[in-house]
Amino acid sequence: MAIDPNSKPRLAPGCRFGENNNQRVLLMPERALRLNGPSLEIVSRCDGTRTVAQIVHELQKLYAKAEPARVEQDVLGYLGLLSDQRALDFQ
């Protein structure tokens, strides 16, 4: 699935943040996904107010030492993975 840079991702119904052994996790109806580093930075921005392009830009600034194209590729790939797992909705 191609992700529209103008779409606004948010957690899908039934998905929420939680903690397990002092580790942030994304709780989904059938499983939990451990979040750390970049994955936590990406998911925490999926609040339905930021566009995909804004999220990419924020992460490019946060990881300024990394190649911007690589950051964009990683963000889009992770959003696609979460979409495939039905953890995100896009407005």
Which residues are covered by each model-predicted region?
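Long, charge-rich, low-complexity alpha-helical segments
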Residues: 32-91
